Amino acid sequence: MGVLGGDAHVPIGSQVSPGSVVVTNNESFGHRKLLKGVDFLVRIKAFAFCLAVIVLLKNNVQTTVIAPGIVLQAKYNNTKAPVSLLVLASICCGYAFLQAVVSLLSFIRDKRVLNNTVLAWLTFLLDQVLTYLLLGSAAATAEAAYIAKRGEDKVQWKAVCGPFKRFCDHFAATVFLSFIAVIAFAVSAAISAYYLFRKSKGFK
């Protein structure tokens, strides 16, 4: 004979201390739904920020006449760092979108889509690798933006943001969004690590 609380079964005569909390299946269900909802929101935000980085970089062009007959043009591909960021942001954008779809399906069905250990490890590793690669690329682009803004006296590089203010402003916005995307990917990586831990312990 026992006492039923939700879906939990607590035998009569068992010792439960006043501070104890019995976790029911309903509470576990709510926790899973919340985590899957957060996972979807974070991944869709990562997709949106990476897409914004791509759009800003591709459309960031400014042409300036500095003297009669002398026209200069500033583009993202004038240096290597933004080019690398564009390529990596494109990869991360596609990956984040696919993972967001998988996460949404998992949330709707209350069941992990593609739920096996190999894919859990693959998701964990890809999240980790892309997070660090995006962080490195964003940092390199931030350095390029700083040099464009301030110059570098040691190697006699002059600041170029005087005649290209709009270009530099958009460039700075791109760097900012890149780091926000890194944060979103880092949170996604933490969630996938948690899923992998639960998988290794035999949980759903």
Curated annotation (Swiss-Prot):
Glycosylation site residues: 77
Transmembrane segments: 37-57, 85-105, 118-138, 171-191
Iron recorded as keyword: no
Cell compartments where the protein resides: Cell membrane
Membrane topology: Multi-pass membrane protein
Coiled-coil ranges per UniProt: none
Domain of life the protein comes from: Eukaryota
Residues in compartment: Extracellular: 58-84, 139-170
Gene Ontology CC, one term: plasma membrane
Family classification: Belongs to the Casparian strip membrane proteins (CASP) family.
Assembly description: Homodimer and heterodimers.
Protein name in UniProt: CASP-like protein 2U2
